[in-house]
């Protein structure tokens, strides 16, 4: 599909109608991190579980200065009515209020602009719906991460939170996070940092894994 964003691209400063009124995207983000995530349709089973989990994790994102905003091709009216079902799914009072807004993209303008349409999933009129896309933007409004899932597979919002924690850590410190890393685990020293500099940067210690190649590139340090 036309449109789409690449890592490092600045988010378009679009305007949109949402469940909390009309927004301009850059103003909504402010100086926060932001997650824009699309779902195929309101009142569907997988989407209900996804937004329910996002709502449960919203306080964890908020304390890390991350704003959430959802999007689909449904109307604001549908979003508000569906929010009651989402809250009921979470065993909470079935109100129209969620801890994040949902964008009304019934004309698919943003879905086309951002490359969010899934040509394999069509509505009753034969029009493509939105895929399960996740965009993570930094305070500089640049895209730091993108994830694209098909309609049939729900996303793991705990994994999205884990990735955001990694993105924020590695934006501040000269480290990388290894496979299956969790907050609090040891991290990896970037291979571009000379050994003597690494000792100064990481006073908790740098631990090198000995390898048959003799190359000292697997270097760990406790999470800064």
From Swiss-Prot:
Domain of life of the organism encoding this protein: Eukaryota
UniProt GO MF annotations: 1-acylglycerophosphocholine O-acyltransferase activity; peroxiredoxin activity; phospholipase A2 activity
Sequence positions bearing Phosphothreonine: 44, 177
Sites of Phosphotyrosine modification: 89
Active-site residues from the entry: 47, 140
Modified residues (N6-acetyllysine): 63, 209
Region of interest (Required and sufficient for targeting to lysosomes and lamellar bodies), ranges: 31-40
Protein name per Swiss-Prot or TrEMBL: Peroxiredoxin-6
Species for this entry: Pongo abelii
Phylogenetic placement of the source organism: Eukaryota, Metazoa, Chordata, Craniata, Vertebrata
